[in-house]
Curated annotation (Swiss-Prot):
GO BP annotations listed: translation
Name of a matching Pfam family: Ribosomal_S6
Functional description taken from the UniProt entry: Binds together with bS18 to 16S ribosomal RNA.
Species, as recorded: Serratia proteamaculans (strain 568)
Sorted UniProt keywords: Ribonucleoprotein, Ribosomal protein, RNA-binding, rRNA-binding
Comp. bias intervals (Acidic residues): 121-132
Protein name, UniProt field: Small ribosomal subunit protein bS6
UniProt key word rRNA-binding: yes
Gene Ontology CC annotations of this record: cytosolic small ribosomal subunit
InterPro entries linked to this entry: Ribosomal_bS6 (IPR000529), Ribosomal_bS6_CS (IPR020815), Ribosomal_bS6_sf (IPR035980), Ribosomal_S6_plastid/chlpt (IPR020814), Transl_elong_EF1B/ribsomal_bS6 (IPR014717)
Coiled-coil regions listed: none
Family note: Belongs to the bacterial ribosomal protein bS6 family.
Amino acid sequence: MRHYEIVFMVHPDQSEQVPGMIERYSATITNAAGQIHRLEDWGRRQLAYPINKLHKAHYVLLNVEAPQEAIDELETNFRFNDAVIRSMVMRVKHAVTEASPMVKAKDERRGDRREDFANETADDADAGDSEE
């Protein structure tokens, strides 16, 4: 079986349906004896340019190992699902399992916020001790 990277963008008004879509597409892959190596829900993001007069979309990334029949079925599902505004399926040489740069950047920002919060609470505790 070959390895694929799949990205699809969902209409922002249909963001509530994304978990169900992910479940359905994941089931399609696993039922065809495929394997999901990485699944990332990037959430609602700004588009680089408007698509169908939309400026935002909900992004989902999948890295899978699956037979061609499963990929064909996924592409057909993307094509006939009105909520999916764009999709891209690329064949890659090896399975990709590490976090994508999008998730790494998000985690770094979250880590910086945690450190800032920890520093603020420590400063507040120090200030409270000196007042007594």
